[in-house]
Swiss-Prot record:
<comment type="pathway">
    <text>Metabolic intermediate biosynthesis; 1-deoxy-D-xylulose 5-phosphate biosynthesis; 1-deoxy-D-xylulose 5-phosphate from D-glyceraldehyde 3-phosphate and pyruvate: step 1/1.</text>
</comment>
<comment type="similarity">
    <text>Belongs to the transketolase family. DXPS subfamily.</text>
</comment>
<dbReference type="InterPro" id="IPR020826">
    <property type="entry name" value="Transketolase_BS"/>
</dbReference>
<keyword id="KW-0460">Magnesium</keyword>
<dbReference type="InterPro" id="IPR029061">
    <property type="entry name" value="THDP-binding"/>
</dbReference>
<feature type="binding site">
    <location>
        <position position="188"/>
    </location>
    <ligand>
        <name>Mg(2+)</name>
    </ligand>
</feature>
<keyword id="KW-0479">Metal-binding</keyword>
<feature type="binding site">
    <location>
        <position position="295"/>
    </location>
    <ligand>
        <name>thiamine diphosphate</name>
    </ligand>
</feature>
<feature type="binding site">
    <location>
        <begin position="128"/>
        <end position="130"/>
    </location>
    <ligand>
        <name>thiamine diphosphate</name>
    </ligand>
</feature>
<feature type="binding site">
    <location>
        <begin position="160"/>
        <end position="161"/>
    </location>
    <ligand>
        <name>thiamine diphosphate</name>
    </ligand>
</feature>
<comment type="subunit">
    <text>Homodimer.</text>
</comment>
<dbReference type="GO" id="GO:0009228">
    <property type="term" value="P:thiamine biosynthetic process"/>
</dbReference>
<dbReference type="GO" id="GO:0019288">
    <property type="term" value="P:isopentenyl diphosphate biosynthetic process, methylerythritol 4-phosphate pathway"/>
</dbReference>
<dbReference type="InterPro" id="IPR009014">
    <property type="entry name" value="Transketo_C/PFOR_II"/>
</dbReference>
<feature type="binding site">
    <location>
        <position position="87"/>
    </location>
    <ligand>
        <name>thiamine diphosphate</name>
    </ligand>
</feature>
<dbReference type="GO" id="GO:0008661">
    <property type="term" value="F:1-deoxy-D-xylulose-5-phosphate synthase activity"/>
</dbReference>
<comment type="function">
    <text>Catalyzes the acyloin condensation reaction between C atoms 2 and 3 of pyruvate and glyceraldehyde 3-phosphate to yield 1-deoxy-D-xylulose-5-phosphate (DXP).</text>
</comment>
Amino acid sequence: MPTTFQEIPRKRPSTPLLDRAVTPVGLRRLGEAELETLADELRLELLYTVGQTGGHFGAGLGVIELTIALHYVFDTPDDRLVWDVGHQAYPHKILTGRREQMGTLRQKDGIAAFPRRAESEYDTFGVGHSSTSISAALGMAIAARLQGSDRKAIAVIGDGALTAGMAFEALNHAPEVDANMLVILNDNDMSISRNVGGLSNYLAKILSSRTYASMREGSKKVLSRLPGAWEIARRTEEYAKGMLVPGTLFEELGWNYIGPIDGHDLPTLIATLRNMRDLKGPQFLHIVTKKGKGFAPAEVDPIGYHAITKLDPLNAPAAAPKKASGPKYSGVFGEWLCDMAAADPRLVGITPAMKEGSDLVAFSERFPLRYFDVAIAEQHAVTFAAGMACEGAKPVVAIYSTFLQRGYDQLVHDVAVQNLDVLFAIDRAGLVGEDGPTHAGSFDLSYLRCIPGMLVMTPSDENELRKMLSTGHLYNGPAAVRYPRGNGPNAVIEKDLEPIEIGKGIVRRQGSKTAFLVFGVQLAEALKVAEKIDATVVDMRFVKPLDEALVREIAGGHELLVTVEENAIMGGAGAAVSEFLARENILKSVLHLGLPDVYVEHAKPAQMLAECGLDEAGIEASVRERMTLLAL
């Protein structure tokens, strides 16, 4: 296994065992003594595959042994295997008949970055967001019981995902219904416990064995006849285990806890899983793994190698020269946050486990006492911000659009109803590319504009983003600024912290007959099309409050209004324009351009925009078609 870039051979080595393990059926024909070699081959395969396509990397390297052991011991797909989030599922895809398709990973019309039910019968539950696996597996376990089936449901969840409240809701529920399921905690950060080594591995084999389980149940029946005897025995067992393993919390919830064991020790994994396969009721196995296992750079820098673009410099094609572009929108936000924090001591920054992605690293270093990473807990993040706002703080919640959906009730009930000063910096708005529909920010304008008192802004470039962040920070009430992934058009950024006038759009180009009303970063494409057809272009800037006076004026002087947004057309910014026109009894032809009523599948962002008709060519074609229909 290569441990550095320089050790990556130009020619892919042979993988005789992996060639036989095309599916779990072939895997189960291998002898146990061959599985260590298979693990080496699978790691190498993952290195080459992700090096070619890009994608999530470190997590998959860390679960090679676990993936092999699960498909070796359990009768998948009849036994239901649910991967939480899905970042670690590439080895699973390779072993379940998709090895030859891995070269299309995350590409248009290729296989998805996450498990998808439509892609394989081995993908029992579609994922992308975190902390859903235990609830899903619990539902599957209860359904199996109702159907008279003894199939097992297994959830694999990481220690990071276990921080979300939803995971604990399921952990609390499963023992109440005595679900026949197994939860595997993949502890790759050692945030819950340290690996206690061989003694813990040995203890896990004993405690998971059928002999121990039978003795335990037999003792329970005998001692239950003696007043207090079983309770004393239970506590003695708990204290003895507690001296070696950290499972008290899970035991108290009603789970049979085993571990922690070494997640890279295949013989121990297989023996323990075989034992636990035959146990009834809710079972909990705690394994400790190393993210990036087997590739030194990823082991040293697990955050940097969580996801990669191109890894193999020897085999990758030469990169095309990049077009000149401005800074990343997230970088503009991060710089503004530091500047405003220096000017306003009331500002605090909150993120649900997205410090690097949302560009809060500099803020966390400069203002550590005002920085709060609440982990994967979006609901808590929003209400935590609401509580701080009640006491005079000015919280800024930096969150991806797709994850704000998870805290929507808190946004409405805890922030908006109380009209609290919370600013939501909504990153990754619109189409995000290769991660596909689970990560797209397709709906935020629709679900935000219906909230009374909410200020909703859509910058068209980096400078407007900075201005709107200041506007939202100074606004009395809840505010949201949504901006896309990637780089801006290289606009000149004014470094002051002055707000802009709320609810006012700007006419960027004056034309005739046709007018573009643009909400967001498609302004540049609209301006290019407008030059060809002599159209007016308006940078609307505010979805709520809508600049109704400007819309009325533009409607009065043009025959066709074209709204443009990178959000679902249904209920979006364009819908706000049509609602206003209808309310004012203004009859005007309106063309809405935005995201269609489908989930846009993974591809390059440019390909996705073209598919939705939101690139220059698509916008021009749609507008010309409507103009022809209207004889303009």
